[in-house]
């Protein structure tokens, strides 16, 4: 299985409370792009679980590849729940998300993405002024549900 390198600026952890709220509804059994440092397993080259949570790297190319893979997995009868930035003017949204999503939810406010320490504990990094800050983009939850 090939490994890919994720730029640390493109690699943030989902806040646990946000994830758990979605997990209660969808009962996730797989995350093809979990938070980690450095070299990671390429979630694009493997089959996904039956119920998947995906917070992909936000760089355009990787985000688009993960959305396309999510649509493929949906067509196999799986559920893929994405947490991605709102970008409704893009080709990605109009060609892939809008015609295939079974649900789109726009998140009020901005999510405070974080990092994980060596023990796996979530924390919010501080900016140059010593304060935590929200993400720089609005977010949406996009569901591709192939169960029906």
Pin down the residues of each PLM region.
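Class I S-adenosyl-L-methionine-dependent methyltransferase catalytic core
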Residues: 1-148
């Amino acid at each position: 299985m090939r490994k890919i390198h994720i730029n640390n600026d493109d690699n943030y952890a989902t806040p646990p409370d946000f994830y758990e709220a979605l997990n209660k509804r969808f009962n996730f059994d797989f995350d093809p792009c979990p938070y980690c440092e450095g070299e990671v397993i390429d979630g694009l080259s493997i089959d996904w679980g039956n119920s998947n949570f995906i917070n992909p790297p936000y760089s355009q190319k990787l985000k688009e590849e993960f959305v396309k893979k999510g649509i493929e997995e949906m067509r196999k009868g799986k559920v893929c729940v994405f947490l991605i930035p709102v970008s409704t003017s893009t080709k990605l949204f109009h060609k892939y998300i809008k015609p295939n999503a079974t649900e789109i939810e726009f998140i009020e406010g901005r999510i405070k993405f974080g990092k994980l320490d060596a023990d796996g504990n979530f924390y919010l990094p501080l900016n140059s002024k010593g304060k935590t800050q929200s993400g720089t983009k609005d977010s949406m939850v996009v569901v591709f549900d192939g169960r029906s």
